[in-house]
Structure formats: C-alpha cells, structure tokens
UniProtKB/Swiss-Prot annotation:
Name of protein: NADH-quinone oxidoreductase subunit H
One of the record's GO cellular component terms: plasma membrane
Protein role: NDH-1 shuttles electrons from NADH, via FMN and iron-sulfur (Fe-S) centers, to quinones in the respiratory chain. The immediate electron acceptor for the enzyme in this species is believed to be ubiquinone. Couples the redox reaction to proton translocation (for every two electrons transferred, four hydrogen ions are translocated across the cytoplasmic membrane), and thus conserves the redox energy in a proton gradient. This subunit may bind ubiquinone.
GO biological process, one term: aerobic respiration
Family: Belongs to the complex I subunit 1 family.
Self-association state and partner proteins as the record states: NDH-1 is composed of 13 different subunits. Subunits NuoA, H, J, K, L, M, N constitute the membrane sector of the complex.
Topology within the bilayer: Multi-pass membrane protein
Catalyzed reaction equations: a quinone + NADH + 5 H(+)(in) = a quinol + NAD(+) + 4 H(+)(out)
Organism expressing this protein natively: Ectopseudomonas mendocina (strain ymp)
Length: 330
C-alpha cells in the first residue's frame, strides 16, 4: 500500500478526529433536552420525565422517533427552498462554531490563527437562518419573531465581540490555543477580565435565544415565533441547533476565561479532557438554571439593557485593558 503515505495518514486521522468531535457535540446537544427536563423537574420539586426507561433515560430516544415519523410538511404559501435552507443553516452555523475550540492539547477540529474571528462569522451566519425562517414562512408571527431575533442577535453580537477584545489585547493572538497557553502561565482571564466575562456570558445567552432572552420565540406573545410553521425534522434541526449553541458558548467560556483544559492551580494535568468537560457541564447547568429562575423581560427592556448597560460596561473594560497593556509594554 504505497499510496498510504505519512501525509495521507495524518490527513485521515485529522478528518476522523473532526468527525468524532462534531458527532459528539451533536449527541450532547440532543441529550441536553433530557438533562434540562430532569434538572428543571429537580429544581422545581416535580418528577420530570420518568416513564420511558430507567429514570426516564430513553425519553430522548422516544422524542427522536416521534419527530422522525412526523409529517415533513411545508406550507403551500411558503418559499420552499429558503424554508428548507433555514434550519440547515441554523444547525450548521452553531456546529461549525465549535470547530475552533481546542478540547485537549491534542484534540480539536481546527487550529486556526483567526479562531475567534471564525466564531464571530458563524455566529453572524446564524442570524440569516432566523431571518430566512421568518420571511419564508409567510406568517406574521414568524416574521415578527425573526425580526426580534435579528435585532437582538445583532445588538448582542456587538458586545460578544467587544468583550473578547480585552482577552485578545492581553494575549496578542486570535488563536484559541494561544489563549489557553497564556492562561496556563498566568491568571485565568476570569480575574483580570471579569467584566468581559460577564458581558460575554450575557451576550452568549442572548445570541442562543435562551431564557430570559428568548423573545424571538415567546410562546405567550408570538406562538413560538419563527418556529411556528416548522414540524418534524426541520423543527428538530432548529431544536438541536439551539442546544449545540449552548454547548458551544459554554465551551468558549471555559476556553477563553477558565483556562480551557487546565485544572485549577495546575492540578492533575494528566486528565485535560476531564477538566474541560467538567467546566463545560457547569456552564451548561447555569444556562438551564436561568430558565428555571429568571422571568422573561419585555422586548424593549432587553434592547435597552444591551445598549444602556452592556455597551458602556464593555467599552470601559476595553479601555482599561488597553491602557494597562500599553503601560506594561512601556
């Protein structure tokens, strides 16, 4: 097998790693539905799903079978091509955003020098999915939900980007591995960039349209918003894409502010995946806890909060960080 050169083997191993990691992220996103319902039931002092399998563990399998056999219906008044394209973009954008996150020193999909910029590009692409879904459905509730979503996402993506500029200024690189290595030799960025972390976390919740920033799909006001005409696997792609977004934002918080795969104080460096998974699971639980504990504000309050609170806080954090970096360089 002379054609099996070392270069080809290296490419095949890299492709296999990418497939395994992305499939694992999709499976985690699907399983989060069950985890969320069990945790919400626990926190709200009720049972939650407990009928299908031991402790309700097969509930997600039952849901997937039900979703698979539902009618894949497209409204006759919809723009069919864009209607079908929207959930694909929503799912693919969040999955591709995870590709730049290093899980361990040797495991990751892509090691890009412009990793953070690639994440911003994928986050911006997800806005098109929501707009396409609302416009192509030819439904007033879907259109209102998509307009809300686009305005909210574009607003909070400004702070999502600005919150990370303090980290980039200190490290001097957009590469995610460089950021993790910097934190291994210095303080985790949760301490010097605490305000940047707070803003990034708030913006991350808003960009994923999670409670309390789930205005685009507010059931009481918009009858599920831009999802209203979707059913079956198309709705399932939106559904899983939202949970993949939670996993992606949680993993980014760990990578950018909590040392990535490193344990606290250099503890047990032999198990990098354990530390990464543990910290990511913690932030996923925080996402779920927000749904269980915080009421949904009005849409105007959400937008006012973004521009009147998040923007000044982010700019002050960026100015102070820039001044300190310049002072240290002189």
């Amino acid at each position: 097998m002379n054609w099996l050169t070392p270069e080809l083997i290296e490419i095949l191993v890299a492709v296999l790693k990418a497939i395994v990691i992305l499939l694992a992220v999709v499976v985690c996103g699907a399983l989060l539905s069950f985890v969320e319902r069990r945790l919400l039931g626990w926190w709200q002092d009720r049972y939650g799903p407990n009928r299908v399998g031991p402790f309700g563990m097969f509930q997600i399998a039952a849901d997937m079978i039900k979703m698979f056999f539902k009618e894949d219906w497209t409204p006759p008044f919809a723009d069919r091509f864009i209607f079908v394209l929207a959930p694909m973009i929503a799912f693919a954008a969040m999955l591709m955003a995870f590709a730049i996150i290093p899980i361990t020193p040797t495991w990751g999909v892509a090691d890009l020098n412009i990793g953070i910029l690639f994440f911003f590009a994928m986050a911006g692409l997800s806005v098109y999915a929501v707009l396409f879904a609302g416009w192509s459905s030819n439904n007033k509730f879907a259109l209102l939900g998509s307009l809300r979503a686009s305005a909210q996402t574009i607003s909070y993506e400004v702070f999502l980007a600005l919150a990370l500029m303090g980290v980039v200024a200190q490290v001097g690189s957009f590469n995610m591995r460089d950021i993790v290595d910097y934190q291994a030799q210095n303080l985790w960025f949760i301490i010097p960039q605490f305000f940047g972390f707070c803003t990034f976390f708030i913006a991350g919740v808003a960009v994923t349209h999670r409670h309390p920033f789930d205005q685009p799909e507010a059931e009481q006001e918009l009858a599920d918003g831009y999802h209203i005409e979707y059913a079956g696997m198309k709705w399932g792609m939106f559904f899983v894409g939202e949970y993949v977004g939670i996993v992606t934002i949680s993993a980014l918080l760990v990578t950018l502010f909590f040392g990535g795969w490193h344990g606290p104080f250099g503890l047990l460096p032999q198990i990098p995946f354990f530390w990464f998974a543990l910290k990511t699971a913690f932030f996923i639980m925080i996402f779920i806890l927000l749904r269980a504990s915080i009421p949904r504000p009005r849409y105007d309050q959400v937008m006012a909060f973004s521009w009147k609170f998040c923007l000044p806080l982010t700019l002050i954090n960026l100015l102070v960080t820039g001044a300190l970096v310049l002072a240290a360089a002189q």
